[in-house]
């Protein structure tokens, strides 16, 4: 296996109200707010990582990975959000000739996935990077074109399991929320040093929080805030009681917003999707699973542009050579089936979209590719 590189005690937060299950698109890849509300997740207790929509991902990507050989020889799959390596393990097991490149910014995730995927030897290359570092990762691994990309967005169960990371509002922990533990900015930095107007903007834009201004005012008045428990208590005071009784846990939007801001998640995604599309070979496929509306809008917009004709508007016929470079493999966004949700409740919020590259400009070979 190749390794590359780029650049408090658990405690239940005290809420006098019950924590209802979310009815809208909660933001979690592997442990949703619905799981938390149902008691399916206990801080400090490791959970089995059940890959979301695993069979559907295999169904969509395998044709691209077996175009040359039925065992995947000559094909490269990039798992841009490696996490615990659940999806990666399935593809490597099914296709004994496949080479997989796994990306993750979290060194703990790379360690866990590396141990899990070690039996596959040099068929696996792991790169520590955000998923917008695709071009550099491919250059480091000597790959010019990719047969398939898989993106499984959001926060992982491992990150939620580790209380000290500060991602969960169900346990008291330091206000951290960094996916890369070496990154300089933490959630505590945001709430304790940013101007009130900037905190308001973050909560409104990244959390779609309608009480953003009220919350920001309370934060500035009460800071410094150092733990998730302190922030949860503040949110209970800041959000009006009627609003706390509907729409899920009152902290979910603020925690989502801070996490997105700390990790630059949306900017990274906006750069990553075009980079992935540009690296696909003809016949290659990309699958993206999003778990909250902000991510899904970005994916939807990028995919719509990729599947649009390049013929100038107003012409009555399609110009030769101007056909769309990509075709959609899904009709809009696919959802998990009731059976899938029954087996894996974490799949309830997922929106899956997929494309295949069918024509157009060839992928530009990278100078560093061997």
Swiss-Prot record:
Could you list this entry's UniProt keywords, alphabetically sorted: Cytoplasm, Methyltransferase, rRNA processing, S-adenosyl-L-methionine, Transferase
> Is Transferase found in the keyword set?
yes
Subcellular location per the Swiss-Prot or TrEMBL entry: Cytoplasm
Please give the catalytic activity noted in the UniProt record.
cytidine(1402) in 16S rRNA + S-adenosyl-L-methionine = N(4)-methylcytidine(1402) in 16S rRNA + S-adenosyl-L-homocysteine + H(+)
| GO molecular function annotations of the record | rRNA (cytosine-N4-)-methyltransferase activity
Region: Disordered; residue ranges are 333-370
Q: What is its EC number?
A: 2.1.1.199
Query: What sort of enzyme, by top EC class, is this?
Result: transferase
Q: Where does S-adenosyl-L-methionine bind?
A: 85-87, 104, 131, 152, 159
Biased composition of type Basic and acidic residues is found at 333-345, 353-370
Chief localisation class: cytoplasm
Q: Which GO terms describe its cellular component?
A: cytoplasm
InterPro entries in the record: RsmH, SAM-dep_MeTrfase_MraW_recog, SAM-dependent_MTases_sf
GO BP, sorted A to Z: rRNA base methylation
Q: Which HAMAP family did the record assign?
A: 16SrRNA_methyltr_H (MF_01007)
- Record's family? Belongs to the methyltransferase superfamily. RsmH family.
Question: Per its UniProt record, what NCBIfam families does this chain match?
Answer: 16S rRNA (cytosine(1402)-N(4))-methyltransferase RsmH
Reported function: Specifically methylates the N4 position of cytidine in position 1402 (C1402) of 16S rRNA.
The protein in question is named Ribosomal RNA small subunit methyltransferase H
What is this organism's lineage? Bacteria, Bacillati, Actinomycetota, Actinomycetes, Mycobacteriales
